[in-house]
């Protein structure tokens, strides 16, 4: 069996990105940097800023696929990638597809997703976030042999331990502060310890 590496997983995702771009965006989406990082509470995310510097004059957007979710079937990973590509499409076309700091996916996101080969379903408080592959996406996956792509051999679920963050409250003005260990603080507003 071939050894699974971060670079091989990223290369497979880049191939998916190219296939999806050609099939659902007529190849018009700019290249993006595909990253693999653990994203708590999400399968992936799109970064609206061009945070990756390629050279002096070229910067690129980032699409992250959560490394903790790479054990899912390739079709589900492709649906997540397409979900983030729809955000990219909306961003470069000045379509405001989310609110509540990018959490709530509105009807404009739904329309863009449906127009670009993705099925989305409503989830209370989050909007049109439940992503499922359409028949067109399933067909593209078969045509491009995505079912044979295995992005992760074995990922283990883990339960996070108790948080080490503490919340401190000024007894006079109510100002709050968080710290990861016991600290001696003085309130900057009312100067009380």
List each language-model region with its residue ranges.
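Active-site recognition of the HExxH zinc-binding catalytic motif
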Residues: 79-92
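An amphipathic alpha-helix signature
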Residues: 78-79, 110
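Metalloprotease/metallohydrolase-associated module, dominated by Zn2+-dependent proteases
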Residues: 2-72, 95-193
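Conserved glycine-rich acetyl-CoA-binding loop
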Residues: 75
